[in-house]
Design a protein with these regions (language model features):
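Rossmann-like adenosine-cofactor binding region
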Residues: 57-62, 174-269
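Short beta->alpha connector loops at strand-helix junctions that form conserved
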Residues: 31-32, 52, 74-75, 90-102, ...
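An N-terminal-biased, well-structured beta-alpha scaffold segment characteristic
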Residues: 1-94, 216
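Glycine-rich Rossmann-fold phosphate-binding loop(s) that bind the pyrophosphate
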Residues: 151-152
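A conserved regulatory-domain signal marking ACT and ACT-like small-molecule sensing domains
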Residues: 318-529
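Oxidoreductase and adenylate-handling cofactor-binding alpha/beta cores
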Residues: 105-124, 144, 163-167, 295-308, ...
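Rossmann-like dinucleotide-binding domain for NAD(H)/NADP(H)
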Residues: 89, 93-94, 226-344, 361, ...
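Phosphate-binding beta-alpha-beta segment of Rossmann-like dinucleotide-binding domains, i.e.
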Residues: 89, 97-145, 157-160, 164-165, ...
Length: 529
């Protein structure tokens, strides 16, 4: 019996379809070509959608996809997926960059050779019955300096291959320290040095506000005369109009593009330049790559739907596979603390302050914050909030979220503190994990306690007077509620005190009403963790 339906669009390789079919729990629905109108009609029944680059997964489509849980992009680029809208709708977006790494790197190398030796132009004239040997004199790559901008999977593979060919490779990546000693022997430099020293420059960065028009008239002016440029990453990183002028002037001796700012593009004036070569976005277009990315993304989607396992996510703060088991106790602690504190509060939520201390800072805190916010918002929104859209939903509802990191506190190697403020009250709870890996609440509203939060609990505050606990026990006994554990805290003798009682069975509202009638009881409520 199939539990999930997944739409496969844009000609996804059949190898991926087989991956989904093999689960026996997912029905793959394949539409290599489908009209927009038809897609908007059928997407409402889909739990997952897998696309290549043609289908626009935009706000309109997402608004029609009532039960959509995940969008998979077979490949790297997600220009056709509205990440912001997907996040707002609580839809996970993932891609499969690894499957096309080798193929795209090889395509870049092919373009590099073609650019250096004028291969496409020479081929074209020969097919036009011209033997123009002297016209297409090229340059050697050996000994030349290649500047690689972006050292992700593809950029690193291009750099490795070009080193093996005898090129001097220098690289710039905004996320790698220029002083880093890389095992590959790559020389890390600033982007300005790449501009000044490289004979060839290839870009391998995503298209963002920071990288758009990264190479423009100003940066080209800093380059060597006769520099050659390659873009097999995303259109728009190299300004096409500025490149056109640089080719005409001879400042840039040649350029090779596999991508354009607008695609498909057969009318670009760049295509009229003799020293410009291009391919129609073929970087990942090999039999092997299409099969691999199809298998990868379908496996990722299946694992998410069937096992709630996340990898390759683009709008979700995931844990690395090796971190999941190691930090699971912190995930458990965060979940229980949030579940506990939200049941203490009344009124409309206004702000959430989360403080992480000590060892917990070693993990992905965005992931923990999403877990905490989901638990805090769930009682109000029910099915409307998940780990993917929790931060967005909080912001949308005007809830201020503050996250801070501090060193380890005295007596605790790790500590998570959540302070929840509403329009009527404020509560703060802190918890830790000891060597036994069990989550413990160690402070509630400034009162020191030590309790493993689990199951049914009664939380009450009282004036610290004799007889309160005895009367409480009597009422619970009369109502057949068995106490499994009791944890007390007080500010001073005779002052305010609080208690947490772990009980073996659910507590009815009428029992709590009786407890509230006890002399010196200030407040009482049931909490279930």
């Amino acid at each position: 019996m199939s539990y999930f339906k997944v739409l496969l669009l844009d000609g996804i390789d059949p190898a991926g379809v087989e991956v989904l079919q093999s689960t026996n729990s997912i029905t793959p629905i394949v539409h290599d070509k489908i009209s927009r109108e038809k897609l908007l009609e059928i997407v409402s029944e889909a739990d997952g959608v897998i696309v290549r680059s043609a289908t626009a997964v935009d706000r309109e489509l997402l608004s029609k996809a009532a039960q959509l849980k995940v969008v998979g992009r077979a490949g790297v680029g997600i220009d056709n997926v509205d990440l912001e809208a997907a996040t707002e709708h609580g839809v996970l977006v993932m891609n499969s960059p690894g499957g096309s790494t080798t193929t795209t790197a090889e395509h870049t190398i092919a373009m590099l050779f073609s650019l250096a030796r004028n291969i496409p132009q020479a081929c074209q004239t020969l097919k036009s019955h011209k033997w123009e040997k002297s016209k297409f004199k090229g340059v050697e790559l050996t000994g030349k300096t290649l500047g690689v901008i972006g050292l992700g999977r593809i950029g690193s593979e291009v750099a490795r291959k070009c080193q093996a060919m005898g090129m001097n490779v220098i690289a710039y990546d905004p996320f790698i320290n220029p002083d880093a000693n890389l095992s590959s022997g790559l020389v890390m430099v600033g982007v300005e040095q790449v501009f000044r020293e490289a004979d060839f420059i290839t870009v391998h960065v995503p298209l963002t506000d920071e990288t758009r028009n990264l190479i423009n008239t100003a940066s080209i002016a800093k380059m060597r005369d006769g520099v050659r440029l390659l873009n097999c990453a995303r259109g728009g990183i190299i300004n096409e109009n500025d490149l056109l002028e640089a080719l005409k002037s001879g400042k840039v001796a040649g350029a090779a593009f596999d991508v354009f700012e607008t695609e498909p593009n057969t009318e670009s004036p760049l295509l009229q330049q003799d020293h410009f070569i291009a391919t129609p976005h073929l970087g990942a277009s090999t039999v092997e790559a299409q099969r691999k990315v199809s298998e990868d993304i379908c496996r990722q989607v299946a694992d998410f739907l069937l096992k709630n396992t996340v990898y390759g996510a683009l709008n979700f703060p995931q844990l690395d596979p090796g971190q999941v088991e190691h930090y699971q106790h912190f995930v458990d602690l965060a979940t229980r603390l949030a579940t506990f504190v939200v049941q203490l509060a009344d009124g409309r939520m206004q702000s959430v302050s989360i403080r992480y201390s000590g060892e917990v800072n070693d993990m992905n805190l965005n992931y923990l914050t999403s877990i905490i916010l989901r638990r805090l918002l769930a009682p109000v929104l029910r099915e409307g909030v998940n780990l993917i859209n929790a931060v967005h939903v909080a912001k949308q509802r005007g809830i201020k979220v503050e996250e801070t990191r501090v060193p380890a506190q005295e007596n605790f190697t790790n500590l998570i503190t959540i302070e929840l403020k509403t329009d009527t009250d404020s509560h703060r709870v802190s918890g830790t994990v000891f060597t036994d890996k069990l989550p413990r609440i160690v402070n509630v509203d400034g009162y020191s306690v030590e309790v493993v939060p689990r199951g049914n609990m009664i939380f009450f505050t009282n004036t610290d007077k004799p007889g309160v606990i005895g009367k409480m026990g009597t009422i619970l006994g009369q109502c057949n509620v068995n106490i499994a554990g009791m944890y007390l805290g007080r500010e001073r003798q005779g002052g305010k005190a609080l208690a947490l009682l772990l009980v073996d069975n659910p507590v009815r509202q009428e029992v709590i009403d009786q407890v509230r009638q006890i002399d010196n009881i200030l407040s009482a409520r049931v909490i279930r963790v």
